[in-house]
Amino acid sequence: MVGLRTLSVLLITMFMLAPMSGCLDNEDEKPPGFQWPDRAETGCLGEDVNASCEVYLDGFTTPTNSLHHPTKNEVWISDLDGRIVAWDGGQQRLVANISNLISNCHTEAGLLGFSFATDFANASQVLFTYIGKANCETKEVTNLYLASGDVVNGTVAENSVRVLREIEQPYRNHNGGHLLALGDHTYLWGVGDGGGSNDPQGHGQNETSPLGTIQHFHYHNGTIAPLHNTTGTDQDYTLHRGLRNPWKFDVDAQNRLWIADVGQQCFEEVSMVPVLQASNFGWSEREGNREFTDPSDCTKPASEPPAEMTDPVLIYEHENGRCSITGGLFMDWGPEAWQGGYLYGDFCTGEIWRTTEGADGSYDGELLIDTETMLVGFGKGLDGELLLFTWTGTVYSLDTSGV
């Protein structure tokens, strides 16, 4: 008898190999590029898993982020379709809807991230990142935007949204978009390499391009400014580069930045550096801890990176149905057995790991639990629950007290 876990992997593998609605255009990914599966939920946990999983909230297209409100006892959860919903434990309400401003023409487009302004108690502002409106009947490619909006009477007025930065996109995929507030009016913004297979325009190693980077900026009173004033150009926004699609990242109590960077054909990556130590993570000269070639050669031996590049601290291969990393929270909360490492998972298999550091300073991934979901991210619930964001639009809370 085929178990749910086996069936899930088989179905996803079939989806990835066959044409389907929602797959990437050939102009975005060359075969055998990743093919998005249909949104068909298979459940949260398989059999014989010593944990419980409950629906926390549903009705989303694809939930992307959750943040605790700075001044109210509620959590805000963003949706790829352009909405943000607030949850106070008893009532769910719509607090933002910028769907008229965004594009959902591609499976990786939409409202990608948001953050409360670090001085929210005084400014009552929210920052957004999104892909701009496009004509889905054409192959129109629209740009990546960073914007702010005013919160008035608990909701964001669409007419208050102001564009702060615009980054030109050559393709529709690899948009990144995560926003992380560092405090004192400073933020990190993840930007993908612009899409297409194999970084066709070489953005990852182009020092003048904002694509394939993590941007670092100051925002206060409606004004944005770079924090690395070395060239007098937009290059001064770039802190880290050489990334393919830094979908999620987090900072731990030691001010180390943990990045889940989605791989090409062979390896998924977790990178870690001091948050303000400008770094080049090697894409597209390297994938994982190897030189990158087009077409990809997953059998190449590992090699030392050039002196100016930083390899990931942890990689995993595309095997046993694994396909795409999703991060990621550094766990200094939650179940004791899950603390002390960066939490990450795989979109296709639903497996969840935690980074562990060995005595020699190397890092490995400890498999914590095997879910049945198509994971797109993690969050923290109103009462400290570990939330799982899924491709199918459901937010689950995972009780791991028995793990």
PLM region descriptions:
Residues 30-193, 248, 256-263, 321-359, ...:
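Acidic, Gly/Ser/Thr-rich repeat motifs that build Ca2+-stabilized beta-propeller blades
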Residues 28-52, 154-157, 223-231, 293-309:
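Blade/loop signatures of beta-propeller domains
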Residues 147-156, 217-225, 273-281, 355-361, ...:
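Short loop/turn segments immediately following beta-strands, especially the blade-tip
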